[in-house]
Amino acid sequence: MEPQVTLNVTFKNEIQSFLVSDPENTTWADIEAMVKVSFDLNTIQIKYLDEENEEVSINSQGEYEEALKMAVKQGNQLQMQVHEGHHVVDEAPPPVVGAKRLAARAGKKPLAHYSSLVRVLGSDMKTPEDSAVQSFPLATCDTDQPQDKPPDWFTSYLETFREQVVKETVEKLEQKLHEKLVLQNPSLGSCPSEVSMPTSEETLFLPENQFSWHIACNNCQRRIVGVRYQCSLCPSYNICEDCEAGPYGHDTNHVLLKLRRPVVGSSEPFCHSKYSTPRLPAALEQVRLPLQPCTPVMPTLSAAFVDENLPDGTHLQPGTKFIKHWRMKNTGNVKWSADTKLKFMWGNLTLASTEKKDVLVPCLKAGHVGVVSVEFIAPALEGTYTSHWRLSHKGQQFGPRVWCSIIVDPFPSEESPDNIEKGMISSSKTDDLTCQQEETFLLAKEERQLGEVTEQTEGTAACIPQKAKNVASERELYIPSVDLLTAQDLLSFELLDINIVQELERVPHNTPVDMTPCMSPLPHDSPLIEKPGLGQIQEENEGAGFKALPDSMVSVKRKAENIASVEEAEEDLSGTQFVCETVIRSLTLDAAPDHNPPCRQKSLQMKFALPEEGPLGNEREEIVHIAEEEAVMEEEEDEEEEDELKDEVQSQSSASSEDYIIILPECFDTSRPLGDSMYSSALSQPGLERGAEGEPGVEAGQEPAEAGERLPGGENQPQEHSISDIFTTSQTLETVPLIPEVVELPPPLPRSSPCVHHHGSPGVDLPVTIPEVSSVPDQIRGEPRGSSGLVNSRQKSYDHSRHHHGSSIAGGLVKGALSVAASAYKALFAGPPVTAQPIVSEDQTAALMAHLFEMGFCDRQLNLQLLKKHNYNILQVVTELLQLNNNDWYSQRY
């Protein structure tokens, strides 16, 4: 491989060096093109200096190779001279053609250049004889060439002429290009004289033929002569060639344009006013485009809550029609159209139009504020009602969730439920003094609508069907759209119990500007009030000594059906049931949910027939025993035999759980019909007895010292029990066993007297305090008695309940999870109960510890500590243990 050769090329006192790294593969055409580009020349003649310092022309590849050999001898360097124009061996061209050519090139090259070119051409020509100058004889100068080939001088002339025409054409194109590129500096006057081609001899013959721009360099502040560099993005920035080679104070990302000469032959004044907005050529515009940041605008849907007309907790009269207004702001960049609607999510507040679940919103532009309105009707029953909504555009939800929350006041007229209750109870005052106590309970705030249903069932059978129908229609539930429910909504505590707004005194105001929390914050100094259930009211009635007598068999059946519809509407408000059905519907796709689940009345009766044991020591729950006329005397020694049965089954969820798996005790004989297996329990806890009302005319046998019940007529009932006597809600007190006892059915009782005086044994302390959280609603009071068809109906309800329980594995799992969450929620926010410290023996403590071990809580010390902390309430202990384990799992995972 040949060594590298350095070519030192000189053109009119301008020297440039070229390094030929691979001379063997570098051709003469490459060198010639490189020199033309470097010096901005079109036609050149290159000569090099040999050893004798004589100029030798290079016109071919062979001559170039000889020059490379000479460079090796001179230390791998070669001195080269560049001359404009080619060596032409012809005479002077005809005068006419020459005149035209000079006229065409006026202002391009000085006249001395062409005169010198003529002298060079004339000196190299071989002049013929006298006559040859005029006649151009071909044979004289080309004796050795064929006749059809033109003479050399003619060929050379045509070649020179062609090159000159091409050069002129290129220069004209450059002129048009520079008219767009050359932008004037505003500080140098309105009409830039430096752009026009000067015609003075001084300008034409500047050193190295460089043009003076009459522009000061922005870096060195000297006049720019020769090559000028102009910023393509900043037209007012110009620097000279020397400053461009070194550091200069400008953005290095801006492209600099190299300009050798200005616009040529500009006839019109080139003023700033004419070219106020100069544009760069398309090629440079393409270079500038990537430098501009691209900020695409993405369509976004967003909204913000601004204001409302009815704040949360507004008191309204029943049946009042009102319109809720929300002021919403379109904070996105998409205009709201007819496809933008306010969709109903969930709630129990009655709509003015039950079919209008989607409300049109105003067509708001981005940044505008409008009013969204929904018309509601206040329900007939007093309480707190809410309705939740959210904006949606073509099925895509956006913006904060808004809601309407009102409090319906009691009836102000004489026909209010409380006044009706007053009338019914006052009519029975003459029968017994205890009816006055019952009136006090019925007028309490917690009894509200269910107290009305209870009294109507006991008092008048004619008005019950219509009233129950009204109650069921007023408590109509709306099933939300599954598409609009988000994970945030499903996990919200507001969906765990859709009546959560009825447990709080008020609901916080809507949170504005798109900040909807996962759960509405609890108001300060607001106690948690649970909506009383039917079982609670029965407990209150029983605690006051009130006992209602049964109706006739046909009337009781009809009332039971009506009460079932009322209770069905009440149970439909369970948030657990609602969320479970929503999730199951989303899992089963097209399967429609059963929004009217089987009446809990029957399913609970099935459960009452089985001795399902609840959590021990729960001060919020009471054993409800149904008896008819007198208490059954039980021995104290039987308690120890049944104590083991108390610990067999424990429910880990709250009293609001839907279904249970019951482990039957050994004493329950499944081979006999249900009517033959009858149980009765006695409460012999010293100093404390609790009773609750069951079916109409059924009284709990709880007082050991009592011999019988005294009816208004003074007659005593025989010691017999109906089949409904065996149904007990095993919400436990302190270690009270179930003692089986077989009894017979009693004769039907007259319904003439609504009250029966209830004698309690001496020392019996009847509780009158309403617990914060009610027990499971006792819904068996509407069942008929004394028929074999009752047994079949209860067995059918048992089968139906088991089928409903096992209908969906996924639904069961979801129910269980949400029940536990609801239990934790209620356990968190329910205040500590005010009860006496229970007396728990060592055996009972050991049984509780064994239950906790079976559940998987094996920390004996922690279990004992929590049992003492919660007064041996195993439900609260399990709830706290679950929370501790859940917190530990979360901390280990994250």
From Swiss-Prot:
Q: State the InterPro entries in the record.
A: Ig-like_fold, N_BRCA1_central, PB1-like, PB1_dom, PB1_NBR1, UBA, UBA-like_sf, UBA_NBR1_C
Q: Per the annotation, which location comes first and is thus the protein's main one?
A: cytoplasm
Chain sites annotated for binding Zn(2+) 1: 217, 220, 240, 243
Modifications after synthesis and translation: Phosphorylated by GSK3A; this phosphorylation inhibits NBR1 involvement in the formation of ubiquitinated protein aggregates.
Listed binding positions for Zn(2+) 2 are 231, 234, 250, 254
Q: Which residues form the PB1 domain?
A: 4-85
Which terms in the GO cellular component ontology are assigned? Answer: autophagosome; cytosol; late endosome; lysosome; M band; phagophore assembly site; receptor complex
Subunit and partners? Homooligomer and heterooligomer. Interacts with SQSTM1, titin/TTN, TRIM55, RNF29, USP8, SQSTM1, MAP1LC3A, MAP1LC3B, MAP1LC3C, GABARAP, GABARAPL1 and GABARAPL2. Binds to ubiquitin and ubiquitinated proteins. Interacts with TAX1BP1.
The protein's name is Next to BRCA1 gene 1 protein
| Species in which this protein is naturally found | Pongo abelii
Taxonomic lineage of the native organism: Eukaryota, Metazoa, Chordata, Craniata, Vertebrata
